[in-house]
Amino acid sequence: VLDSFAHADIGPVDSRAGRIIMEAEAELEDAVPNISMKYDKDLTSDEYAIKAVECALKCAKPSFANHKMFVNELGENYVLASCYNGLALGGGSYTLCRLILGGIAKKSDSIDDFKNNKLPYVMDIMARYMDARIRFEVEESGFFENNFLAKEGFIYRDRFTAMFGLVGLADAVNILLAKEGIEGRFGKTENATQLGVEIMDIINDFNNDHKNKYCEYTGGHFLLHAQVGIAE
């Protein structure tokens, strides 16, 4: 397993194993594996949560994930990968592609052009690209017939989905407002925050309207994925 994808989950209930893991990580201060704490105020004791906070202050992990939210969306048998990506236990993501919103905003003439032309155009291309990758993986690659993990029953094709990612919402909002000569900064002014919400609504509606037959575990839709940042 590549370092970037080596991940462990603890919680939501207190456990000896979870405590040992946090004690070891606080002492070692290593980067691998990444760790998430499934946190639920009704299941996670304050003492256990404080232990996790103390560990995070020393080694920047675990991250805290909203257990109730993930259970509501994916059921009890879910796991977390790379901090906050909820996926089915025994499943995974066929692919992860990203809308670089700041780049799309730079190529847009106005907020209206971004919303009604440039963003829909790029979303359509990315969705069709993801569909093609998924079709190849399932129908041609032989991965789910021949991979060791599938043969041994660790992963199942029908528990897989894909992640429709995005990065740079704040960049996009700030760029678009500047193009229109409107004052405002994402996260600081109401008009900028509202524009961000409108952009996310457009992306969410597109994703809900798009169907992929091999993403049946998530209702035939991709999962939206928010990227923290991107190098280029």
Predicted regions located by residue number:
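Contiguous, well-ordered alpha-helical segments that form the cores/surfaces of helical PPI scaffolds
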Residues: 162-175, 201
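Conserved catalytic cores of very large enzyme subunits
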Residues: 1-158, 179, 185-193, 197-232
